[in-house]
Every structure is written in structure tokens, then in C-alpha cells.
């Protein structure tokens, strides 16, 4: 399977989201344990992501991105990260061109 984006592009997107995790989570008033359950990781693992002790996988990034983008309040916060949403959509759009699926 070919890589859709290179490793440094993925790391940049992951770092951007990681830096925003505490604010995003607080904006919707849920605990680390609750969000960990939603995305299928332990609370300890999520906590390690949030404080930067562990880098999340690309799949975990996508789970968190979709979780936060689907909430109106956190969606607005993500829009303040200049170009972040557009960059993620470009990655997803590239993938979809190969599978004939279109994203907004």
C-alpha cells in the first residue's frame, strides 16, 4: 500500500492536533477517560498523547480529528488552526480520488 502523505506531513498534522487536545477536550467538557473510550484507547494512553509523552498513530489521529470535527464547538476551534482542516481534507481527498469518494 502506497503512502498517501509522507511521514513529516503526518507528524506535522499530529503535532498540531496534539497541541490542541487539552483545549478541544475542555471545550466540550469531557474527561480524558471519556474521550479515550470514544476513540478506543486507554485513559493512560490518551493522557500520554495529551501531554506529549507519546505520539499517536495516524489512525488515532484520524479518530480524534473526526471526533472533534463532528462537534460544532470544537470544529470552530479547529478552524482557528490556520490551514489545518484544509490540509487534512487534502490528504483525504487524495485518497478518495483513488477510490471515487468525495469529501467536503
What are these regions, as identified by a protein language model?
Residues 59-80:
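DNA major-groove recognition helix of helix-turn-helix/homeodomain DNA-binding modules
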Residues 29-48:
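Short alpha-helical DNA-recognition segment
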Residues 2-27:
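A short, Lys/Arg-rich alpha-helix, primarily the initiator
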Amino acid at each position: 500500500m502506497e503512502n498517501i502523505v509522507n511521514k513529516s506531513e503526518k507528524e506535522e498534522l499530529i503535532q498540531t492536533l496534539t497541541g490542541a487536545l487539552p483545549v478541544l477536550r475542555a471545550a466540550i467538557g469531557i474527561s480524558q477517560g471519556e474521550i479515550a473510550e470514544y476513540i478506543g484507547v486507554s485513559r493512560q494512553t490518551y493522557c500520554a498523547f495529551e501531554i506529549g509523552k507519546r505520539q499517536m498513530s495516524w489512525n488515532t489521529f484520524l479518530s480524534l480529528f473526526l471526533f472533534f470535527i463532528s462537534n460544532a464547538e470544537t470544529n470552530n476551534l479547529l478552524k482557528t488552526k490556520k490551514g489545518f482542516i484544509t490540509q487534512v481534507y487534502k490528504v483525504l481527498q487524495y485518497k478518495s480520488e483513488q477510490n471515487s469518494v468525495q469529501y467536503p
